[in-house]
């Protein structure tokens, strides 16, 4: 399958929590997680989820830190190479507020905003209680997230927003 949409996330599972609906609705995604490439459990969970939604994927090995940043010079260089790989119809990443303030989500968003042109979109959630994803997409996101067994303790915190993408 030809991929023409790019999703760049800080951590494996971010794509499912914040962008799972898009991955389920549209084909042709390439998903990059910039952290946890040397963690065999996280790498395998990510690959399994990406295979389940038929997304091309890659996982890099920048350090995963709660109150951390990235080596932005190296990250920009590596991301530019990926961006130049093809003409992307849509590029999606974290919002500048980092969804819930995660410093690495914010840092990645800042880098992406610096190097991506007009077709950059960020994860967002409806604040209207009546606006939710269709039930089948919520089920799909839950199925995706159920593969991240190492992250159950974190995913539990996001139940309230899973339907609001």
Where are each of the predicted segments found?
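Active-site rim/loop-helix segments in enzyme catalytic domains that contact anionic ligands
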Residues: 1-87, 113-117
